Amino acid sequence: SAASDVYKRQIQNIHKGDNIKQKYEELEDKAELILHKMERPVSLSKDRFTPVKTEVTSNLTKEQYEANVKKAKEYIKDGDIFQVVLSQRFEVETDVDPFDVYRCLRTLNPSPYLYFFDFIDYQVVGASPEKLVSVLNGIVATKPIAGTVPRGKTKEEDDMLVRQLVNDPKERAEHTMLVDLGRNDVGKVSKFGTVEVKNFMTVEKYSKVTHLVSDVQGELRDDENPINALMSVLPAGTLSGAPKVRAMEIIDELENKKRGVYGGTVGYLGFDGNIDTCIAIRTVVFKDGKGYVQAGAGIVNDSVPEKEFMETKNKALAVVNAVKEAARL
């Protein structure tokens, strides 16, 4: 097992032969100390209030992305697929400390899954809202997110956008389709008759966008294990499409850059057999003085190319803003 110290960028390995109780108490004390330091007020520099000019470019122009959407809709009309998730990759030149971006991101875009990895020659920072799959005490769960609108500038506008989202036939149909895909994925490793949908199509709000979310659960079969549960769901339908294989072939055709970590998974597997993983979205990869943020939108027959383009920009905005904010620290 391991305990991570993201401030010092260290992982302390805890071996089965160690005094587990003593190690646990030591780590509790260390966590209390870190919390105490985090609660202390700090002074802000004047630079914190100076606008930072950060040029953001994409691997696709607006016209190219919208052309991809139109091509995907042709595949849908031909019966190849029902839905496909098309993304674009945003790029920003920066010398910012990636860990400072992590610090800003967890404040600007609080999410269920927060992570920072330093692989020496590149770093991965993320704040993902979406569970890929978990197995906790024998319960397999996935949490598809499908259906997105930007946050409003006022409460009234925010409420109006939520009403539009929950009553939009296109968004509801897309969400239902991906929930069905999630049920199929969970069902591959679950006991017969145990798969159910909980909290169907609920609203979750984040800093820049509002999503429609559902919970899909089942009881893990006795002859299955958490790794098989992970493999049954990966890649997520909400990042690929339906049917998955054909959707991924179309993604490979239309997207001009490999996705890398985007759409993959980040998580843990414990000695107790539990696993908890998220989808690598709202994530930035730092390498060679550049930050890369990828975001996608689900394309269906009713999709409007310009709206799908704007959805990808809105999804990337929280991460891009964290990079800009970190430059002021």
Where are the predicted features?
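Extended alpha-helical targeting/anchoring segments
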Residues: 1-4, 8-329
